[in-house]
């Protein structure tokens, strides 16, 4: 071996790197707080020293530690939910419960069922749909009245009127839902017992032309005719006519007794609404002594609805050329509010549980509109009908609404929410599956 030459072991030679200009890795510790880390470690080694500390001071120190040492925990560490700090706002006392905010109710935009209703008359002055308290829905199609028992899901034909007497121009259930009054084009009114499916009696002599509106008040059946007369019939006695109201000069197209039975609202073709006193029901002579006369509408008034939570409040809706919903104090006669809807108001229904009002309309949208009362802000618009929605009826539980229109369709809407939990199961069968086995009313 040459003395001037030295062999260097391979492990002392520098490694051949694939990349050049590399340096050692120096981590960035700017986000690391070594002072706090040292404090946290050393504090844990200190012996606990017993000292007298008040409860308030302990609470203060705990909250101060939370504030000063926030975000100094391990990432994704499992720990208990942090305690809420006391608010600095003295009005938010721990003894006061925060005001609960009621969640907004979901309102389905589509109808639950759609049925064909061939022969349904497209006449603004008639009343051809009613849902009784016995859970039976009645609808008049031409000369025939059909019934749907929602409790059993069965359908039946109640009566077909002779051609010389028909068509049927109005229907209305008694308050117990066991008997149905049927107004006819020839001025007669028939009373039918749907349980036995037989006619009980016929009322004649009260009108000179068709009977387009009916309203029950216990044993009194009030009828409104094209002749402008409103007739009170006591169905318990042979000579049933016990009183007549005179105030409308044209057809009476809307009648509604208040829930207490003390006041009657009537709407007519001559843009007038009258409020009548029940004490003048039985009068030996026709009376023109109404309590109030409202003339603010500019079109026929068919839509009438007494408020269920305020006995003296009445909502009315005007037809084509008016399109307004008005609210009246029937004690003072004052108009409380007037809302422009933009289209013919055909029918009105109050919610039985919420402060809400449902209206049905004509051209251009033929929609149902749900309003929040008293702000009258729109909660929902329900579309589906292609012609004016003339008739609406509410189920006994107050949740489902049936609507019938000039397009010869009957639709069911779950617009007023779910039924109470105690009846939810039964209601689901009774209302949502009411027409599951039929597609047509005939």
Curated annotation (Swiss-Prot):
One term under GO cellular component: cytoplasm
Complex formation: The APC/C is composed of at least 11 subunits that stay tightly associated throughout the cell cycle.
Keywords: Cell cycle, Cell division, Cytoplasm, Mitosis, Repeat, Ubl conjugation pathway, WD repeat
UniProt KW Repeat keyword: yes
The protein, known as: Cell division cycle 20.3, cofactor of APC complex
Compositionally biased residues, Polar residues: 86-99
An annotated GO BP: protein ubiquitination
InterPro entries: Cdc20/Fizzy, WD40/YVTN_repeat-like_dom_sf, WD40_CDC20-Fz, WD40_repeat_CS, WD40_repeat_dom_sf, WD40_rpt
Entries under Pfam families matching the protein: WD40_CDC20-Fz
Subcellular location: Cytoplasm
Pathway listed: Protein modification; protein ubiquitination
SMART domains: WD40
Region named Disordered: 85-104
WD repeats by residue range: 121-158, 163-202, 206-243, 247-286, 296-338, 340-381, 384-423
Gene3D superfamilies according to UniProt: YVTN repeat-like/Quinoprotein amine dehydrogenase (2.130.10.10)
Similarity remark: Belongs to the WD repeat CDC20/Fizzy family.
Purpose: Component of the anaphase promoting complex/cyclosome (APC/C), a cell cycle-regulated E3 ubiquitin-protein ligase complex that controls progression through mitosis and the G1 phase of the cell cycle.
Record carries keyword Repressor: no
């Amino acid at each position: 071996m040459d003395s001037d030459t030295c062999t260097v072991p391979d492990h002392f030679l520098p490694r051949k790197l694939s990349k050049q200009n590399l340096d050692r890795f120096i981590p960035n510790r700017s986000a690391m707080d070594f002072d706090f880390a040292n404090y946290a470690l050393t504090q844990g080694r200190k012996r606990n020293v017993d000292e007298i500390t008040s409860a308030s001071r302990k609470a203060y120190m705990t909250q101060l530690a939370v504030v000063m040492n926030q975000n100094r925990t391990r990432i994704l560490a499992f720990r208990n939910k942090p305690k809420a700090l006391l608010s600095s706002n003295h009005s938010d006392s721990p003894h006061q419960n925060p005001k609960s905010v009621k969640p907004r109710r979901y309102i389905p935009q589509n109808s639950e069922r759609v049925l064909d209703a061939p022969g349904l008359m497209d006449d603004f002055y008639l009343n051809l749909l009613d849902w009784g308290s016995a859970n039976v829905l009645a609808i008049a199609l031409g000369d025939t009245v059909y019934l749907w028992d929602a409790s059993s899901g069965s359908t039946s034909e109640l009566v077909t009127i002779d051609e010389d007497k028909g068509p049927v121009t109005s229907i209305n259930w008694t308050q117990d839902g066991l008997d149905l009054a049927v107004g006819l084009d020839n001025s007669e009114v028939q009373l039918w017992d749907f349980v036995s499916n037989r006619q009980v009696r016929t009322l004649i002599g009260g009108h000179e032309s068709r009977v387009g509106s009916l309203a029950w008040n216990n044993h009194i059946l009030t009828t409104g005719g094209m002749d402008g007369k409103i007739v009170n019939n006591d169905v318990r006695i042979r000579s049933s006519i016990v009183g007549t109201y005179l105030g409308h000069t044209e057809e009476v197209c809307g009648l509604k007794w208040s829930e207490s039975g003390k006041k009657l609202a009537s709407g007519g073709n001559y843009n007038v609404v009258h409020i009548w006193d029940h004490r003048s029901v039985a009068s030996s002579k026709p009376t023109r002594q109404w309590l109030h006369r409202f003339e603010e509408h500019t079109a026929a008034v068919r839509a009438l609805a007494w408020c269920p939570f305020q006995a003296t409040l009445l909502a009315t809706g005007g037809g084509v050329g008016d399109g307004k919903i008005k609210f009246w104090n029937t004690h003072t006669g004052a108009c409380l509010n007037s809302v422009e809807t933009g289209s013919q108001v055909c029918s009105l229904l109050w919610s039985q549980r919420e402060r809400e009002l449902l209206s049905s309309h004509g051209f251009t949208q033929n929609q149902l509109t749900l309003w929040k009362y008293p702000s009258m802000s729109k909660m929902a618009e329900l579309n589906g009908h292609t012609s004016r929605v003339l008739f609406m009826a509410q189920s006994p539980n107050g949740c489902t609404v049936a609507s019938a229109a000039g397009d010869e369709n009957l639709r069911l809407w779950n617009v007023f929410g779910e039924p109470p939990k105690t009846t939810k199961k039964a209601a689901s069968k009774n209302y949502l599956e009411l027409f599951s086995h039929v597609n047509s009313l005939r």
